[in-house]
Amino acid sequence: MTKQNTRQKIGIIGFGNMGSVIAHRLSVQDHNYDIFVFDKEKEKLSNLLGIKASKDIHDLAASSEIIILAVKPQDLDHILKEIKKYVSGKLVISIAAGLSTKHIERILGAIRVIRVMPNIAAKIAESVTCLCKGMYATDEDLDLAQELFYYLGTTRIIEEGMMNAATAISGSGPAYVFYFIENSTFDQANIPEHARHDMMRRLEKAAEDLGFDTETAAFLAANTVNASISLLLKTKLLAQELRKQVTSKGGTTEAAMEVLTKDGLWEEAARAALKRAEALARRD
């Protein structure tokens, strides 16, 4: 079979921090994908290499087999209504924090939906990405989504009931790491092993506090801390700069940081992030 016959068309709506990373990671190697992107801020779509800009959101949805929704939670409902008539028979993947597959299905109908939560370390292909599937998605759909996000780092399939907790741990967790390093006396270019293990212990405890089993908590904590440190070392940015990058206004990480900067407790910060994710989901 020729490549032309096997290339999958993937449309990405939203070309911000995460949408652009997903697009570039899927396009830089020969993964047999044709990547289309759309963003309401047209200036973001200039000088694209190996990625095609769609003229509008309807064109992207109509021409894609897989649609990745890389938009903020508050923008999702409008986007879903815009693409509804184009998604029959297609796979929809959402990275919007807090919004369930049930919520998306309520607007789109009986559509195959996968929910995904990557983190900022996707920039260096070391993301810790959690995934779950909706009512109409198949195991094969989940495998395909896992394959796509494997190019961004490690993946973990979890129950949807734990996705908001994953948002608080692996999604917002890098900010806790950056804040810890930012307020430490050691050189951020030479992070001591005892500090690394201290951060892992704190994040693992926070994960268990939110209901993860011991093995999953350890997996998420170790990978999130290691990936965050790796991002810091590879980008050579200050911890404060990376913390600000991962802290979106009104998001789960901002809620966590408001608590962490006051009492320094990772468990309390993670609870605040979870509470914010649940608040975003209350429309369900």
What kind of region is each of these model predictions?
Residues 2-9, 20-29, 37:
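Hydrophobic, well-ordered beta-alpha structural blocks that scaffold small-molecule cofactor pockets
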Residues 2-7, 204-208, 212-284:
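NAD(P)-dependent Rossmann-like dehydrogenase/reductase catalytic/cofactor-binding core
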Residues 15-16:
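Glycine-rich Rossmann-fold phosphate-binding loop(s) that bind the pyrophosphate
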Residues 22-25, 43-49, 56-131, 135, ...:
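Rossmann-like NAD(P)(H) cofactor-binding subdomain of soluble oxidoreductases
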Residues 30-48:
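NAD(P)-binding Rossmann-fold cofactor-contacting core
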Residues 103, 107-112, 128-166, 175-233, ...:
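Internal alpha-helical scaffold of NAD(P)-dependent oxidoreductase catalytic cores
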Residues 118-122, 167-177:
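Glycine/serine-rich anion-binding loops at beta->alpha junctions
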